[in-house]
Amino acid sequence: MNKSILTFAFLASSASLISMGAAAETTISGNISSKCSVFTDTVGVYGNPSPDELSTLVADGGIQPIIRYDVSIADYYTAKISWPNSFTTSPNLTDALNWDGEIEVHNTSDAGMSGYEAAKVEYENVTEYDLSVAGSTWFKVTSEVTYGVDKSLPGGEYKASVEALCIAN
């Protein structure tokens, strides 16, 4: 009889566990490394070819910034580069600034990238390139700014930033 009671008690507790059910929450995680990296290869410097102008062109005494994109998988990324349209640092300026600029392919690691320049998309101060070939591409940036109408820029430090993004398609 004790054996029957023990067996019944065991079966009842097992049935109770089965009817209650069990639940678990399992986490799935992962880390993704970007297959597109952006680097500054050459820092830009403004030349001052005339009292009212700053320019990164070599002919104007400047140094054009060079931005490098390294892409390990083709057709998944877009380079989005903006030439400056404001100063991040400057003396107090009381007149209008007129900005102009250009982004161009400077060098490539693969001959298949030769069509990048012809296929670029430009709007406002932004240039986009479809990075359709794996490898490295160097872009040079031209930045020019004039101050007022025949008005001299005040002495002091001037800085502007190029924004270079790698956008996943």
Language-model features and meaning:
Residues 93-100, 116-121:
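Low-complexity "stalk/linker" and mucin-like segments enriched in Ser/Thr/Pro/Ala/Gly
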Residues 112-134:
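Extended, solvent-exposed segments with strong compositional bias
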Residues 97-109:
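Short, surface-exposed beta-strand/strand-loop-strand elements in extracellular ectodomains
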